[in-house]
């Protein structure tokens, strides 16, 4: 249970993340859960209901104790790191909106995360997915929606949150899509005719009227389609056709990157298409590509020991 003044601050912070920082709903929900976990621990640590003053005067021992508690509770390093980032983000918001200055939390470094290589699908698995995704909608417009969305993600390398934010205004430009991604970073991606044509066909039979600024991909009740709903469609596809366990909407973004790299795309162009802030993030795909080449070499090279 939180003090009403603290809850009001959290509500303002969430609006700030969405409206000014352009964070996805998924990120905002995760950050909110992390912050509440931190405040619940603070409540336990202080043995009294947390106040604004408790938050402002939280010392390094409390923060390190919270991180240690998460570690003891078997949170992954990535989850602990994200949790600390969420709480730091909240404190930055407090600096902007209250009298708080230079809190000790900013001196704490995040734990090192184990870097996992992105998992791409094979080109054959992508083809199977694109050919059969329409089988799982039960309603014609939903079937076409599923195919249009999946083709869009694979053809453009969009994050699922970015793809689900596409509006009719995006369709008005014949040559490219202008995307506002993580951290309000803008990038421009060429339209592939197959993706645009499928979206146009889908909109022609969509039973809901939409304004130019409304997201075009809708759920069965007419509300904006949410990532978990679409991923459930992919789970059906995965199980029926025996596709890899790591098949999700995001794996098609990874596949877009890996397949372009395997077919000769350069890293700088790939970085621009994916919207990566750092080239080192994009370079992870070269490691995946090298593993692919090693596998091909091992199975196909005519001279073996």
UniProtKB/Swiss-Prot annotation:
One of its GO terms (biological process) is chromosome segregation. InterPro entries: CB, DNA_brk_join_enz, Integrase-like_cat_sf, Integrase_catalytic, Integrase_recombinase_N, Integrase_SAM-like_N, Tyrosine_recombinase_XerC/XerD, Tyrosine_recombinase_XerCD. It holds the Pfam family Phage_int_SAM_1. One of its GO terms (cellular component) is cytoplasm. The active site is at 159, 182, 250, 253, 276, 285 (o-(3'-phospho-dna)-tyrosine intermediate). Residues 4-95 form the Core-binding (CB) domain. Its main location: cytoplasm. Keywords: Cell cycle, Cell division, Chromosome partition, Cytoplasm, DNA integration, DNA recombination, DNA-binding. It is found in: Cytoplasm. It comes from the Bacteria. One of its GO terms (molecular function) is DNA binding. The keyword Transferase does not apply. Residues 116-298 form the Tyr recombinase domain. HAMAP family: Recomb_XerC_XerD. Forms a cyclic heterotetrameric complex composed of two molecules of XerC and two molecules of XerD. Belongs to the 'phage' integrase family. XerC subfamily. Site-specific tyrosine recombinase, which acts by catalyzing the cutting and rejoining of the recombining DNA molecules. The XerC-XerD complex is essential to convert dimers of the bacterial chromosome into monomers to permit their segregation at cell division. It also contributes to the segregational stability of plasmids. This is Tyrosine recombinase XerC. The gene is xerC.
